[in-house]
C-alpha cells in the first residue's frame, strides 16, 4: 500500500499554509516520500519553484490548486500539461469573478478529462445536486475522505453515504498545512495573526471565529506514518471502505503525468505560439484584435480612439519590459 499527500498547502496559501516548499522537499527526502502535491488556495505562484525542487530531488510533482466552486472547496490536480493550462485558466476566471474572495460557478468550468477534482468534505459536505452538475463537467471526481480527529466519526459516516448515493468514489487524504509534526502550534499562531485574532479567542473548532485546525495531525505523512495512525486511532471505519479510499489515492497518482515546463531565464514557461504566427508579439497583437472585435468595435469613434491610445501605450510598456 502506498499513500500520497494529495492536498498540500504551502506558505503561498497566505491565510492557512505554514510549511514552505523547501521544508516539504526536505521531509520527503527524510521520510522517503516519492510523490508530492502542491495545491495552494487561490494561488499557483509556487508552482515553478515546486517543479524545479521536485525534479532536482527525484520526487514526482503533482501540480494543483484549491478553488471555491459554488461555495464548495475543491482541490484540482493536473493530469497532464493540458490540465495545467486549464488550472491556470480556472484560477484566472475565479479572480475575475471576485478578486477579494475568488470563486467559480459550474458554468465557468468546461468539460474536461485533463484534471482530477477532489471535493472537500472536511469543512462542508457538498449537495447531491451540486455533485451531479459538477460531475457533468469534470470526468474524474472524488470525495475527500479524511481520518483526522475532531468530528471524524460523523463526517466519515455521512460522506460514505453520500458516496454511495451519488456513485462518487472516496479518496483518502491528509490535508497538509505544515511540514513537521512539531509545527502545529506555530501554524495556529500564524493563522491567528494573519486574520488578526488572539490565541485566547475561541477557535472555529469550538464554535468561535478564530481560524484553527481540527487537530495536530496536519503534517506531511509518509505511508508508514499513515498506517501507524490508522492502527492507533481509526476503529470506526469499515476496512473495505478504508482500503478502497487508499487504493483510489494511489490510482490518482498513477493517472497523473509528470508536468514538464520549459523555462526562459529560469523563471517562466515558454508559451506555445500557434501557426501562422512567428513570435509571441504577433500572436499577442492578434489576441488584442480579437478582443477588440468582441468588445470595442461597436462602440462610438471617440471611445475607440481612447482605447487605441491606451492599447498602444500599454503594448509598448509590455514589450519594452520583455513581458511577452
Language-model features: locations:
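Phosphodiester-processing cores and adjacent nucleic acid-binding clamps
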Residues: 1-324
Amino acid at each position: 500500500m502506498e499513500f500520497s499527500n494529495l492536498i498540500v498547502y504551502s506558505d503561498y496559501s497566505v491565510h492557512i499554509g505554514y510549511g514552505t516548499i523547501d521544508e516539504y522537499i526536505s521531509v520527503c527526502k527524510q521520510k522517503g516520500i516519492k510523490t508530492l502535491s502542491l495545491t495552494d488556495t487561490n494561488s499557483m505562484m509556487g508552482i515553478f519553484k515546486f517543479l524545479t525542487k521536485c525534479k532536482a530531488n527525484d520526487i514526482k510533482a503533482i501540480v494543483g490548486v484549491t478553488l471555491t466552486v459554488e461555495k464548495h472547496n475543491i482541490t484540482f490536480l493536473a493530469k497532464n500539461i493540458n490540465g495545467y493550462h486549464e488550472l491556470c485558466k480556472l484560477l484566472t476566471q475565479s479572480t475575475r469573478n471576485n478578486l477579494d474572495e475568488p470563486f467559480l460557478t459550474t458554468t465557468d468550468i468546461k468539460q474536461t478529462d485533463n484534471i482530477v477534482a477532489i471535493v472537500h468534505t472536511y469543512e462542508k459536505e457538498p449537495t447531491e445536486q451540486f455533485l451531479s452538475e459538477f460531475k457533468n463537467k469534470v470526468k474524474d471526481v472524488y470525495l475527500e475522505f479524511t481520518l483526522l480527529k475532531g468530528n471524524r466519526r460523523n463526517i466519515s459516516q455521512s460522506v460514505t453515504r453520500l458516496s454511495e448515493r451519488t456513485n462518487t468514489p472516496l479518496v483518502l487524504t491528509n490535508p497538509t498545512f505544515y511540514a513537521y509534526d512539531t509545527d502545529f502550534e506555530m501554524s495556529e499562531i500564524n493563522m491567528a495573526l494573519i486574520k488578526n485574532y488572539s490565541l485566547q479567542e475561541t477557535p472555529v473548532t469550538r464554535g468561535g471565529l478564530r481560524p484553527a485546525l481540527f487537530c495536530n495531525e496536519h503534517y506531511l505523512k509518509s505511508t508508514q506514518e499513515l498506517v501507524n495512525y490508522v492502527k492507533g486511532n481509526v476503529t470506526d471505519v469499515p476496512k473495505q471502505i478504508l482500503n478502497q479510499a487508499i487504493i483510489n489515492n494511489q490510482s490518482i497518482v498513477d493517472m497523473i503525468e509528470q508536468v514538464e515546463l520549459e523555462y526562459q531565464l529560469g523563471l517562466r514557461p515558454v508559451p506555445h505560439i500557434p501557426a501562422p504566427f512567428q513570435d509571441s508579439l504577433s500572436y499577442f497583437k492578434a489576441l488584442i484584435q480579437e478582443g477588440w472585435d468582441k468588445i470595442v468595435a461597436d462602440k462610438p469613434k471617440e471611445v475607440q480612439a481612447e482605447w487605441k491610445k491606451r492599447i498602444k501605450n500599454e503594448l509598448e510598456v509590455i514589450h519594452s519590459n520583455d513581458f511577452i
